[in-house]
């Protein structure tokens, strides 16, 4: 069985990353794609489910996992809560041939590249800053001050786009989704992947 591929997905808030991932997963037919579920020390919010949105653990349990080097990446964010990506869980799913998506920012991406040099990374850009702001306002979730802060952070995040293997401009959603699917398809057709996926066939074709 061929190993699954590990993907980093990054984008400024409002670029449509979550919508693209959701649409991709809803269209899959072989259950060979999934989004990694992170560990966190924050309290669950209404509607969040253990193992679906996050794995909710204590600070002591999280720091024990850090000491055992069981996180692919982790960070302590504003407010003092930890967030991290479990290395054993990632390895288990990749071994099953499942493509795993890591929804993280550029800083987490840098950590992961140090541990997994062959990870593939995708950055999603908005068609313009004006459109990005329009989308954030259209959500109706944030105050004017929060939107301004998100826009300021977005410019910093976008400045790291050139650290990624692939870039998708999410202007027309259907085209962006098709571009996303094309990347995943191409990665499954690489020599390394096909040698493992079709090992028996290749051996048969080369048999004398």
From Swiss-Prot:
Essential for recycling GMP and indirectly, cGMP. GO terms for molecular function: ATP binding; guanylate kinase activity. The keyword Transcription does not apply. SMART domains: GuKc (SM00072). Belongs to the guanylate kinase family. Pfam families: Guanylate_kin. Keywords: ATP-binding, Cytoplasm, Kinase, Nucleotide-binding, Transferase. Residues 4-185 form the Guanylate kinase-like domain. GO terms for cellular component: cytosol. It is found in: Cytoplasm. Its EC number is 2.7.4.8. It is an enzyme of class 2 (transferase). It comes from Pasteurella multocida (strain Pm70). Its main location: cytoplasm. It comes from the Bacteria. It catalyses: GMP + ATP = GDP + ADP. This is Guanylate kinase. ATP binds at residues 11-18.
């Amino acid at each position: 069985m061929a190993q699954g591929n590990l993907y980093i997905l990054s984008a400024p808030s409002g670029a449509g990353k979550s919508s693209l991932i959701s649409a991709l997963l809803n269209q899959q037919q072989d259950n060979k794609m999934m989004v990694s579920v992170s560990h966190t020390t924050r309290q669950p919010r209404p509607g969040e489910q253990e193992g679906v949105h996050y794995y909710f653990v204590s600070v002591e349990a999280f720091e024990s996992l850090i000491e055992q080097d069981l996180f692919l990446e982790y960070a302590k964010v504003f407010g003092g809560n930890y967030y991290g990506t479990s290395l054993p869980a990632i390895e288990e799913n990749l071994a099953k041939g499942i493509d795993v998506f890591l929804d993280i920012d550029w800083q987490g991406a840098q950590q992961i590249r140090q541990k997994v040099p062959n990870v593939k990374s995708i950055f999603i850009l908005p068609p313009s800053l004006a459109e990005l702001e329009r989308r954030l306002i259209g959500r109706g979730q944030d105050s004017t001050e929060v939107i301004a802060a998100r826009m300021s952070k977005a410019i910093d995040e976008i400045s790291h786009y050139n650290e990624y293997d692939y870039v998708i401009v999410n202007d027309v959603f259907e085209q962006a989704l098709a571009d996303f699917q094309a990347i995943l398809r191409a990665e499954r057709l690489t020599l390394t992947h096909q040698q493992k996926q079709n090992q028996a066939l290749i051996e048969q074709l080369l048999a004398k």
